[in-house]
């Protein structure tokens, strides 16, 4: 057969689908009970989609196609997300001729150079990638209703008015507040940063450090050395301070509110603190070595402690000053031990080594399983020798901190006898109230980079608009919705619950970037994670909006909150529709149809997205729906999918390790790409794209096409006389239908592919071997029937090839709209399946015996099937499942009693091997019917149950495990 031209077939059917508009559902076609509404997170248009995205979008398309074939009225729409600063940042970097950005867009995304330079205008980036993304989705065969397409921001005014309405609603309900809050901030551009505004570090948490002000007195001046800690309760155990002798520190005037103090912190810390409600005036810069050997006073205990050198202190983390608590901090203990050994370091700073030798550890926490100094014990236990054992030190630190926090009891008055969890909060609160400590916000990691290419800081913003996800009543409604929702996989539910619990105020607007202006404060632009939470409702009316827009009959400015209130929140009212017609210019009957569409399609059945969006978009999606819509319109389910890697490596456009979705289609064909990514892993697991494996799958799809094309030529006649092997094939086909259907209902795409493609292919291969030489009506009937079912089962995965084959089969209309196969009751035959499995097993056993025993020129196989009484034993053991009750039951049978000792051995064997699911079959009949096939396959004579007991094997025969002798 000539090589299959995937591209030609795909283009043919994509054209026909679009012309016939078969994916544009009409609410008049089916009752609401038969509607199915599924959406997926619309793509952000800052570049080409890669094969990781292909997974995210193919899963819902497969499900949409499956449900459509099941007879549902399916809505699967698509739109484009362009809100926020990333696109503006890209334009800025291209304008500045940033080499890395230019390389990504020219060499990785393959943007022609003459087009690339137009990207200095962000609108041109949007236009280019919007067109490319739509082409990719069409080329992928996605069954999208393109009549509902739109894009975000004020560049598409109707949607922008919808977002304005959403925000007025949130504000009315008290869910939008103004105030001060910590945010990620681009210090160069001067804007808050949401998750989508970051190039790196979107998952990096913000830590609340307590900075404790240790006093350093010089010439009568009080100077504070603020030590940053996440364990304020350990301030009672400080034995010394650490600074990095090689780092640059500053002495600075720090003004906060009406208070002014002099601090010494690292140069990096001074910069960061200037964004956190502090005015910093640097007086002096110097190296940390200047501080070594000086003493500071602990503001809590009053103890004077020495400042010691430590290169492990990172000046770019918090204040660059660390308090040492060696009894409870493994790093501190090991650093002191290193100093004791390396006295030359101390001598360099004129510190008497005896000072370090005489440092006394202070025990603060009683911890079961440890003595007074848990850090010392853990270091010794792990065999840590020096600060170079960094991995082990981090392990020890995690172990001690976790154990002390959860199980530790404080030993120092006035908190003696209280749990560490409680003491930690109390001590922090007390120090903050007394003014001897403050809070500094810091990232847990350094790699938090904005889309503008700048390193982010944490800033306290005043007069910022926030969505108050911390509102207790709102949280309760979100929990209620989550309880009612299906979450796939179910294991992700706990993550949603935790996020609802800790979610707090979220900055919802920026001063720069693309988006919708905040309606009551238009200097602010609504950010990308805030205008993408309820657009699934807009999809339901966007078809009508788009049509009016194309006809020039829509004035977006007249789409007021009153209009959206009626469509999405109120009851049907003819009077209201007439009133809105006057106000909007939209005919009352169109307004009525819009409301009908919303009421028909809502609630949303499934929301699909990647697992990275659980902490933000997907949880915000729940919150915003429960805030705005009636309970009957709350979403019903969320399906979360895993990530993709490329040849075992994480995909990264900055490293060039990325495969564009469109390139994968060009290289392999859409159906090959679709089937490959669906077959690799279940929807919730990660997958790895390997080019070599894709090539193998292409050949298998070509074989599928070849087989169906061949079977399509067979004419089907009724009343054919089927043989057992024919019935076996139909039974297996039934099983494939059932298992594929069950898997797709639960989004288990890999399992579905295993049954719909690989299982049928393997069963067919066996069937063709078993029926080789036959060309009768029964075989033709089975193969033609199989072709009809198989093409429909594969249609959600490989729609283009299946449309072509459906046409060859003479199927009515599009296979995309054909009836999904259902099991045929009369095809079920568990007995025949068991018999066929038995034949396979016996053949494998014969091959194994010949191979293991190294029998050359084997001529005959003598097969002895189990006697009837052994079947009775197996059946009783299957029912009773334990030795005593099985033997009691069996000994009631006089025939079985004759074999007493042998019965006991068999029962023990069956129980040990847990052989409980034994279905009786006529082994001899099955073997005799397959005798000719077995002889041909094995190349030896098969003799079944001869009277002669060859090799004394007969007594070894067990149910489903006959005795075999080879000569």
Swiss-Prot record:
Keywords: Aminoacyl-tRNA synthetase, ATP-binding, Cytoplasm, Ligase, Nucleotide-binding, Protein biosynthesis
GO molecular function annotations of the record: aminoacyl-tRNA deacylase activity; ATP binding; leucine-tRNA ligase activity
Keyword Manganese: no
Binding, ATP: 653
Pfam families linked to this entry: Anticodon_1, tRNA-synt_1
Motif placement: 'KMSKS' region: 650-654
EC number of the protein: 6.1.1.4
Reactions performed catalytically: tRNA(Leu) + L-leucine + ATP = L-leucyl-tRNA(Leu) + AMP + diphosphate
Motif 'HIGH' region location, chain numbering: 43-53
Subcellular location: Cytoplasm
InterPro entries: aa-tRNA-synth_I_CS (IPR001412), aa-tRNA-synth_Ia (IPR002300), Leu-tRNA-lgase_arc (IPR020791), Leu-tRNA-synth_Ia_arc/euk (IPR004493), M/V/L/I-tRNA-synth_anticd-bd (IPR013155), Rossmann-like_a/b/a_fold (IPR014729), tRNAsynth_Ia_anticodon-bd (IPR009080), Val/Leu/Ile-tRNA-synth_edit (IPR009008)
Record's keyword annotation contains Zinc-finger: no
NCBIfam families: leuS_arch, PRK12300.1
Protein family (similarity comment): Belongs to the class-I aminoacyl-tRNA synthetase family.
Name of the protein in question: Leucine--tRNA ligase
Species whose genome carries this gene: Pyrococcus horikoshii (strain ATCC 700860 / DSM 12428 / JCM 9974 / NBRC 100139 / OT-3)
Source organism phylogeny: Archaea, Methanobacteriati, Methanobacteriota, Thermococci, Thermococcales
Gene: leuS
């Amino acid at each position: 057969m000539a090589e299959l031209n995937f591209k030609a077939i795909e283009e043919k059917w994509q054209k026909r689908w679009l012309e016939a508009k078969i994916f544009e559902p009409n609410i008049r076609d089916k009752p609401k009970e038969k509607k199915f509404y599924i959406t997926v997170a619309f793509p952000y248009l800052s570049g080409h989609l890669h094969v990781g995205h292909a997974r995210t979008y193919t899963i819902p398309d497969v499900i949409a196609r499956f449900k459509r074939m099941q007879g549902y009225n399916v809505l699967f729409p698509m739109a484009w997300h362009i809100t926020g600063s990333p696109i503006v940042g890209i334009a800025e970097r291209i304008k500045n001729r940033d080499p890395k950005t230019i390389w990504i867009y020219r060499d990785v995304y393959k943007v022609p150079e003459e087009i690339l330079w137009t990207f200095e205008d962000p609108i041109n980036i949007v236009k280019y990638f919007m067109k490319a993304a739509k082409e990719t989705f069409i080329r992928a065969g996605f069954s999208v209703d393109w009549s509902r397409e739109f894009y975000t921001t004020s560049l598409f005014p109707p949607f922008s008015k919808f977002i304005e309405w959403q925000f007025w609603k949130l504000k009315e309900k008290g869910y939008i507040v103004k105030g001060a809050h910590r945010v990620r901030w681009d210090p160069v551009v001067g804007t808050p940063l949401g998750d989508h505004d970051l190039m790196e570090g979107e998952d990096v948490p913000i830590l609340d450090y307590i900075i404790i002000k240790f006093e350093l007195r010089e010439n009568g001046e009080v100077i504070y050395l603020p030590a940053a800690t996440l364990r304020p309760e350990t301030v009672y155990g400080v034995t010394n301070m650490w600074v990095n002798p090689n780092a640059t520190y500053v002495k600075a005037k720090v003004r906060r509110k009406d208070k002014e103090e002099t601090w010494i912190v690292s140069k990096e810390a001074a910069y960061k603190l200037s964004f956190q409600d502090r005015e910093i005036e640097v007086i002096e810069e110097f190296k940390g070595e200047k501080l070594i050997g000086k003493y500071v006073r602990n503001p809590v205990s009053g103890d004077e402690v020495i400042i010691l050198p430590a290169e492990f202190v990172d000046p770019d983390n918090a204040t660059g000053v660390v308090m040492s608590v060696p009894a409870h901090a493994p790093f501190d203990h090991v650093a002191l031990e290193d100093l004791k050994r390396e006295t030359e370091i101390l001598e360099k700073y004129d510190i008497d080594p005896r000072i370090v030798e005489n440092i006394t550890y202070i025990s603060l926490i009683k911890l079961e399983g440890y003595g007074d100094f848990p850090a010392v014990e853990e270091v010794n236990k792990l065999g840590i020798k020096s600060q170079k054992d960094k991995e082990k030190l981090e392990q020890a630190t995690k172990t001690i901190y976790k154990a002390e926090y959860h199980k530790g009891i404080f030993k120092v008055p006035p908190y003696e006898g209280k749990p560490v969890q409680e003491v930690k909060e109390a001590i922090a609160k007390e120090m903050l109230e007394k003014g001897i400590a403050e809070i500094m916000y810091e990232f847990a990691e350094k790699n938090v980079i904005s889309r503008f290419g700048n390193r982010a800081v944490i800033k306290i913003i005043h007069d910022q608009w926030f969505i108050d996800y911390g509102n207790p009543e709102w949280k309760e409604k979100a929990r209620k919705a989550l309880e009612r929702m299906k979450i796939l996989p179910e294991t992700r539910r706990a993550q949603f619950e935790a996020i609802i619990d800790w979610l707090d105020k979220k900055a919802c607007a920026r001063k720069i970037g693309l988006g919708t202006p905040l309606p009551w404060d238009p200097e602010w632009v609504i950010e990308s994670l805030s205008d993408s939470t309820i657009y699934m409702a807009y999809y339901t009316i966007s078809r009508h909006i788009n049509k009016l827009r194309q006809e020039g009959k829509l004035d977006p400015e007249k789409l007021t909150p009153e209009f959206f209130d009626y469509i999405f929140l109120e009851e049907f009212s003819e009077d209201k529709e007439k009133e809105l017609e006057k106000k909007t210019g939209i005919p009352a009957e169109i307004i009525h149809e819009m409301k009908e569409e919303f009421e028909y399609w809502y609630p949303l059945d499934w929301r699909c997205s990647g697992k990275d969006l659980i902490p933000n978009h997907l949880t915000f999606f729940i919150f915003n729906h429960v805030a705005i819509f009636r309970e009957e319109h709350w979403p019903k389910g969320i399906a979360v999918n895993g990530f993709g890697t490329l040849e075992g490596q994480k995909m990264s456009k900055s490293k060039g390790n990325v495969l564009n979705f469109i390139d994968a289609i060009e290289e392999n064909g859409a159906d090959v790409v679709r089937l490959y990514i669906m077959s690799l892993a279940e929807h919730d697991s990660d997958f790895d794209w390997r080019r070599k494996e894709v090539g193998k799958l292409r050949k298998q799809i070509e074989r599928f096409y070849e087989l169906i094309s061949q079977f399509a030529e067979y004419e089907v006649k009724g009343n054919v006389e089927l043989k057992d092997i024919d019935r076996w094939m139909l039974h297996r086909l039934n099983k494939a239908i059932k298992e594929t259907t069950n898997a797709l209902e639960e989004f288990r795409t890999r399992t579905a592919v295993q049954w719909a493609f690989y299982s049928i292919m393997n069963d067919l291969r066996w069937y063709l071997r078993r029926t080789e030489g036959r060309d009768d009506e029964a075989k033709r009937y089975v193969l033609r029937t199989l072709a009809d079912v198989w093409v429909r089962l594969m249609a959600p995965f490989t729609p283009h090839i299946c449309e072509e084959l459906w046409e060859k089969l003479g199927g009515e209309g599009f296979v995309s709209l054909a009836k999904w196969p259902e099991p045929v009751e009369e095809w079920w035959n568990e007995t025949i399946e068991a018999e066929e499995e038995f034949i396979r097993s016996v053949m494998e056993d014969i091959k194994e015996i010949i191979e293991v025993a190294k029998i050359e020129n084997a001529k005959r196989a003598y097969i002895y099937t189990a006697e009837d009484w052994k079947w009775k034993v197996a059946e009783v053991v299957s029912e009773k499942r334990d030795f005593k009750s099985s033997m009691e039951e069996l000994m009631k049978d006089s025939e079985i009693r004759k074999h007493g000792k042998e019965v006991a051995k068999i029962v023990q064997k069956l129980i040990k091997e847990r052989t409980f699911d034994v279905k009786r079959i006529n082994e001899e009949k099955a073997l005799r019917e397959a005798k000719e096939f077995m002889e041909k396959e094995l190349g030896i004579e098969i003799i079944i149950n001869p009277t002669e007991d060859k090799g004394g094997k007969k007594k070894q025969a067990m149910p489903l495990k006959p005795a075999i002798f080879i000569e």
